[in-house]
Amino acid sequence: MSLDISQFPVLAQANTPNELRQLPQALLPQLADELREFLLKSVGMSSGHFASGLGTVELTVALHYVYNTPFDRLIWDVGHQAYPHKILTGRRDRMHTIRQKNGLHPFPWREESEYDTFSVGHSGTSISAALAMAVAAEKEQAGRKVVAVIGDGAMTGGMVFEAMNHAGDLHNDMLMVLNDNEMSISENVGALNNHLAQLMSGRFYTTIRESSKKVLKGMPVIKEMAKRTEEHLKGMVVPGTLFEELGFNYIGPIDGHDVDALVETLRNMRNLKGPQVLHIMTKKGRGYEPAEKDPIGWHAVPKFDPSLFKKPATKPGLPTFSQVFGKWLCDIAEQDEKVLGITPAMREGSGMVEFSQRFPKQYFDAAIAEQHAVTLGAGFACEGYKPVVAIYSTFLQRGYDQLIHDVALQRLPVLFAIDRGGIVGADGPTHQGAFDLSFMRCIPNMVIMAPSDENECRQMLYTGYCYDAGPSAVRYPRGSATGATQVEAMTALPIGKGVIKRLGKRIALLNFGTTLAAALTAAESLDATVVDMRFVKPLDVDLVKEMAQTHDVLVTVEENAIMGGAGSGVLELLQQLKMPKPVLQIGLPDEFIKHGSPDEVIHDLQLDAEGMLAQINAYLAN
């Protein structure tokens, strides 16, 4: 149910940017307050990304007020912070559906709105897209402006600097708004973040701020900023130095929660020539005390009552697979000080908080830089360490060349703990772990494991730790484990060997991963054999051969793209063995999987027991 818009009298007048631009500027502070309150109540009703959007309310209002969107292009990096943008661009009455099946997309999405000029979800893409749009705008000579909004967390990724370097060289008109809240999903790390953090200290921050104030009062922008920088800050490392060296004109920092200052500054900068950076300081979670105090914990939230100032208590239940991994990592680190945990800025999500606290010298946050994280692991392996790279399936895509060139080619024993394999649900197509089995299976020297439950996950992680002939990967899903009894003792599994879980007749289900429980349920109605294959690569050749010889039909089951996945590996093996056999592949279709709850998505894709049974019966009937 949507909120009663009559409770928000100014916001009610600004359902679109055109309506917003008709408001007198004096009403913008009230509009920002109402927008923040609407966002707070809306996310409380629907769940979703929370703290980031609270921090960009004033910026969103100012951008749509000054720029002629959608004619002028506005690109949001990642998109966590774009909920206010959705509210102001005609989607206010559907905000309660965000991230839900058939509801609003969780991120800016081109198919959803003309105001969403570039579909996003992964970090660091906005500057490249904005540069291309700026070049196109110059070719068209229609007076179109281009703005990219990027957070300080995304500035730790190399793609951003590749794009900025190119933009500085081409020198097209574009604006990059650096939203500096000193907080991405995990604390930012590295020299750049330390550089930005200096803004908050004493004379250094005050001097830059005063220079920017003079710019705001109408002085010739580029000339005056250069003059003040030279006079006051010569010989010091100033915030703008990095951007100036890359060919950008730097303005800031300014208060990102002062909507009037933002409007005036954006007006001043709108017609400046060449690439520009506006550096704004914001607070993630602004306006809601619990989120201000704990922006990481309030990054994304379930449904909650804002008036209670706390998230709903989580019911005691099964551990998540991320927690299973985190516990294993701590257990193995106690035994071996050469175990090193690496994450690309996903400490909380990957279950590594306890490890980072207990073993700080063995913990490495590579920031939002997946390529670097993978090759960092390769370098450690060269020196005899035991690197464990904990990474989401969707983000491993970003380190694919490094996986091939730096790890597998050299047969380096790097263990990849791949979280969020398969359906992740509400974050949609940018985050579904649909492709990892396919893109890893074709890489020589890889060992790929898919546990069916938490105990098997623990043993497979240990197997990967023990394996020193090359890289290995353990791929597990988001969410709660299955409830299997965990065995504390760790035993390395025989490489490339599966286990028969149920003996039946005629039909054999070859299962890869946590779809095992559903496969067993479906098998009861079919009196089918079920095999927990365990290894996607190498396949258990003897077991596949045995199943083909003793059954009429084989069915492969995986929560991965059918094309190139584990089932394709079974078909390739049967071809090599010259054993023609009917094989039904159950998995993800050749399409990007939309958002919805995991259960809804799995049901729609017929990956639950009911759906598997229906697919198998239809195959047998034909």
Curated annotation (Swiss-Prot):
CDD domains the record matches: TPP_DXS (cd02007), TPP_PYR_DXS_TK_like (cd07033)
Entries under Pfam families matching the protein: DXP_synthase_N (PF13292), Transket_pyr (PF02779), Transketolase_C (PF02780)
Residues reported to bind Mg(2+): 152, 181
Protein name: 1-deoxy-D-xylulose-5-phosphate synthase
Similarity-based family: Belongs to the transketolase family. DXPS subfamily.
Any one GO molecular-function label of the UniProt entry: thiamine pyrophosphate binding
InterPro entries: Dxylulose-5-P_synthase (IPR005477), THDP-binding (IPR029061), Transketo_C/PFOR_II (IPR009014), Transketolase-like_Pyr-bd (IPR005475), Transketolase_BS (IPR020826), Transketolase_C (IPR033248), Transketolase_CS (IPR049557)
Binding-site list for thiamine diphosphate: 80, 121-123, 153-154, 181, 288, 370
Domain of life per record: Bacteria
Function: Catalyzes the acyloin condensation reaction between C atoms 2 and 3 of pyruvate and glyceraldehyde 3-phosphate to yield 1-deoxy-D-xylulose-5-phosphate (DXP).
Gene Ontology CC: cytosol
Cofactor note: Binds 1 Mg(2+) ion per subunit.
Cofactor: Mg(2+); thiamine diphosphate
Gene3D superfamilies tied to this protein: 3.40.50.920, 3.40.50.970
Reaction equations catalysed: D-glyceraldehyde 3-phosphate + pyruvate + H(+) = 1-deoxy-D-xylulose 5-phosphate + CO2
Enzyme Commission number(s): 2.2.1.7
Name of the gene encoding the protein in the UniProt record: dxs
Oligomer status and interactors: Homodimer.
SMART domains: Transket_pyr
Source taxonomy: Bacteria, Pseudomonadati, Pseudomonadota, Gammaproteobacteria, Alteromonadales
Keywords, comma-separated and alphabetical: Isoprene biosynthesis, Magnesium, Metal-binding, Thiamine biosynthesis, Thiamine pyrophosphate, Transferase
Organism per entry: Shewanella oneidensis (strain ATCC 700550 / JCM 31522 / CIP 106686 / LMG 19005 / NCIMB 14063 / MR-1)
